[in-house]
A protein has these predicted regions:
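The feature marks the mature, well-folded catalytic cores of soluble enzymes
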Residues: 1-162
């Protein structure tokens, strides 16, 4: 018996009273207009959004890295981006990152985002990596000097399209 098993055995032997686990039913926050809340959350975290009635053209995208986001979260302004390319480093090396997300893919909260990811059984078969990205990279020193782009993009713009 190794140390771990010995410790667990001793714990089990000394547990005298067991309790049923309570049911935890956490409901995430809901918004009347998740898209509007998502836009506000992006502004709060120093990001930007552009809402289009039609997808942006190449000249509107500019000369920055552009990627499609699968899920946008109204609660905190983050976007789920799965790995579709072999190289994912552009998500973090770009000076400016544009993310395109559909209005129908804006959810209220992280609970709904993870439920949507989990509901897609093909998701993790097709993708090796996924990340939530939220606003530009920021850091501050002890004096409170805020620096953008310290670990990733200096600016993030989310294009909300139909």
């Amino acid at each position: 018996m190794n140390s771990r098993e010995d410790i667990l055995k001793r714990i089990r032997e000394n547990v005298h009273e067991r309790y049923d686990m309570p049911e935890i039913n956490v409901k995430g926050i809901q918004f009347a207009d998740p898209v509007e809340q998502f836009i506000n959350a992006c502004k709060t975290i120093s990001g930007a959004t552009v809402s289009f009635d039609t997808p942006p053209s190449d000249d509107q995208r500019g000369e920055t890295s552009t990627v499609r986001g699968d899920i946008a979260v109204a609660e905190n302004g983050c976007v789920w981006i799965p790995q579709r390319e072999d190289d994912r480093s552009f998500l973090f090396k770009s000076e400016h990152l544009n993310i395109i997300v559909s209005r129908k893919d804006v959810v209220n909260n992280m609970h709904e985002a993870y439920d949507r990811i989990a509901a897609s059984t093909e998701y993790f078969k097709d993708y090796k990596f996924g990340t939530f990205i939220s606003g530009p990279s920021k850091t501050a020193d002890i004096e409170g000097a805020l620096v953008y782009g310290a670990q990733a993009a200096r600016s993030v713009t989310v294009y909300v399209v139909p």
